[in-house]
Amino acid sequence: PSAFGAEVVWWENDFPAVRPLIGDKVEKVRDLVKPKVTAGELGRILDYTRVFLERTEGKIPIRLGDIQGPLDNAALIFGHTAFLEALITAPCEVHRLLDMITGLMIEFTAAQRDFVRAAGAEFVPSSFQPWLPDGRGISVANDVAVMLSPELHDEFGVPYLNRLSDALGGVYIHSCGNWTHLFPSLEKVRGLRGLEFGASEAPYEKVLARFGGRTVLACRVGLHRDIRFAGMADFVKRVLAAAPTPRGLFIHIDITNGLVDESWPETDLEELYALLDAGNPDWPALAGRSKAP
């Protein structure tokens, strides 16, 4: 958003925020032009990339900056309420902005990759876990999608995810919240490398049943206030029990993006290792069943 001219507000004790640039004045979109890859905070990311490369002498991999995704960036530039309204009342202007954002994301990713490769370091094109090999896609935050119908996501989400995928070798999509209503739309995304989600937010049983074995599923505890796990071991047990296959399953064994309280027990890593080693007793039977004619 800052590359397009939106003001970033740096709170003292919280994450930064963006003041909407467009609001209800949709005509402002017509005056926007695609920025350079050094505009706004993008330039700062590239500067930090250079510094990190110099100080590590190119020996440590460098991740893609967290540049979010087309829908998320457009919503920040508009302001979320104005953006959701504009999907219905001003679709041409929304598509114009999404087109510029997508092009800028592709160009910025290439620029950061070039800096990293020129230093002889490994470029990791994902800003969240797990590791994604260079050339196999790009991580995309698609949080705004949870507020869209499948039809709106088909129109305003999928074309730009596909453009990113075609240009960069795939997309690895993160979304907070419950996006299970978008299953049919997400299946239209080309080169879907993975889905990153909170188990308490997007019901993990449904996600695993629909996409298990088809793409990487990176599952974390989640931030739902009313749906809780009784500890990390309980979380791991329940995810393993629901997973139809271990293929592509990645379980976040941390609470960085998990809502827990004082009742959360201390995590016993040895217990987790044993659970992961044991897996799901149904997996061999399921694997055999999938091979049956």
Regions found by a protein language model. Give the residues of each.
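Active-site loop segments of alpha/beta catalytic cores
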Residues: 2-18, 34-293
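Residues forming anionic-ligand binding surfaces in small-molecule and nucleic-acid pockets
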Residues: 21-31
